[in-house]
């Protein structure tokens, strides 16, 4: 496991974004862990998160010209990732959408730089894939090309069929999806963290029941 992925998991635990216990997912499954990126909710944690996104994006090798953040969580994530990339010497434009169109000021649903070239979508997780699908439609309608999707965590679990939500997005839209960390990374972290050993069997069992191959 790359050091930055291990660092990200530790960071998420420290911020209580990642928790262990018994949780019910949207799909009604009993999960031994819970990830809530909305708890990266202060300046310093958002700055650190943005640097993890930038590292993951650069390591992925995905070619892109700009960033797009789907409303609402993706808005701050795209802006922050753009700042972190600039900090590392890669300055790219970013844009985001509104849920409701404005009929005054700049109008419309899109805000920020014009959508041009290859556009990388930034979001926290992929659940049903609705946000990505809407983003792809917006990007293509503007005459630009979706380049891929960058997320914080890939749970690597099946949706309604045999594929995970991430795999479904990759297959349906022909896009690469890069995650800062995955369930596989989380298991590796637990295996090397004696203080968290009590949670390892539950996470392994969850992956055995609902997991997909990477």
Swiss-Prot record:
Coiled coil: none annotated. It catalyses: orotidine 5'-phosphate + diphosphate = orotate + 5-phospho-alpha-D-ribose 1-diphosphate. GO terms for biological process: 'de novo' pyrimidine nucleobase biosynthetic process; 'de novo' UMP biosynthetic process; pyrimidine ribonucleoside biosynthetic process. Keywords: Glycosyltransferase, Magnesium, Pyrimidine biosynthesis, Transferase. 5-phospho-alpha-D-ribose 1-diphosphate binds at residues 26, 72-73, 98-99, 102, 104, 123-131. Gene3D superfamilies: 3.40.50.2020. Its cofactor is Mg(2+). The keyword Glycosyltransferase applies. It is an enzyme of class 2 (transferase). Belongs to the purine/pyrimidine phosphoribosyltransferase family. PyrE subfamily. This is Orotate phosphoribosyltransferase.
């Amino acid at each position: 496991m790359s050091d930055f992925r291990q660092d990200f998991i530790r960071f998420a635990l420290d911020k209580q974004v990642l928790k262990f216990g018994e949780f019910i997912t949207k799909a009604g499954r009993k999960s031994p862990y819970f990830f809530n990126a909305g708890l990266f909710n202060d300046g310093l944690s958002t700055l650190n998160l943005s640097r993890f996104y930038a590292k993951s994006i650069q390591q992925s090798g995905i070619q892109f010209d700009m960033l797009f953040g789907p409303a609402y969580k993706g808005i701050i994530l795209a802006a922050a990732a753009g700042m972190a990339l600039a900090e590392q010497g890669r300055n790219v434009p970013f844009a985001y959408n509104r849920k409701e169109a404005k009929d005054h000021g700049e109008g419309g649903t899109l805000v920020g730089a014009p959508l041009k070239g290859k556009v990388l979508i930034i979001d926290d997780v992929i659940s049903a894939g609705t946000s990505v699908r809407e983003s792809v439609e917006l990007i293509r309608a503007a005459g630009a090309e979706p380049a891929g999707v960058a997320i914080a965590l890939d749970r690597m679990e099946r949706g309604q069929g045999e594929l995970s939500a991430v795999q479904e997005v990759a297959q349906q839209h022909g896009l690469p999806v890069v995650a800062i960390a995955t369930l596989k990374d989380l298991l590796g972290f637990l295996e090397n963290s004696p203080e968290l050993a009590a949670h390892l069997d539950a996470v392994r069992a969850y992956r055995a029941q609902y997991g997909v191959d990477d």
